[in-house]
């Protein structure tokens, strides 16, 4: 997880998509980075500092750098937005995962990443988490 924050600190402002962990959001804020916390889950609609919109279907303006924390749950953001991406997806295959992630290559291909700055895989709780930092510009 530290690597994720190493990537985030390269940016002054970031759109964070589908991150259920307020610990992650608050850590990014403590790094003095402006966070646009966007989550489509209606359970977050009354929470302060959460933009409760679906970035796929609603008119949501994303920042140049986008951290998508649950790529397996949505349409690939890189097919709709041009910029710098920090992408995380896992192969746990939860009910409702419409975009299963089984490799770094899948994240790269789905999001039209032209240049990968860094990537890694972490095994946590008997399944893999895939991370990519790159751009489709």
Residue spans for each PLM region:
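S-adenosyl-L-methionine
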Residues: 1-11, 37-67
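Residues at the starts of beta-strands that form the adenosine-phosphate
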Residues: 13-14, 34-38, 82
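A short SAM/SAH-binding and catalytic strip from SAM-dependent methyltransferases
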Residues: 63-77
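Conserved SAM-binding loop of SAM-dependent methyltransferases across substrates and taxa
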Residues: 21-33
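Conserved class I S-adenosyl-L-methionine
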Residues: 11-21
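Short, polar loop motifs at secondary-structure junctions
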Residues: 21-22, 38-46, 74, 90
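C-terminal substrate-binding/active-site "lid" region of AdoMet-derived donor-dependent transferases
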Residues: 74-132
């Amino acid at each position: 997880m530290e690597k994720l924050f190493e990537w985030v600190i390269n940016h002054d402002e970031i759109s964070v998509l589908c991150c259920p962990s307020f610990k992650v959001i608050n850590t990014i804020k403590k790094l003095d980075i402006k966070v646009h916390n966007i989550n489509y889950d209606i359970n977050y609609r009354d929470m302060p500092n959460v933009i409760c919109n679906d970035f796929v279907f609603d008119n949501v303006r994303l920042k140049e750098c986008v951290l998508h924390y649950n790529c397996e749950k949505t349409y690939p953001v890189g097919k709709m937005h041009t910029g710098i991406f920090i992408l995380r997806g896992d192969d746990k295959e939860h009910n409702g995962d419409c975009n299963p992630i089984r490799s770094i290559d899948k994240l790269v291909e789905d999001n039209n990443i032209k240049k990968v700055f860094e990537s890694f895989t972490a095994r946590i709780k008997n399944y893999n988490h895939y991370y990519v930092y790159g751009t489709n510009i």
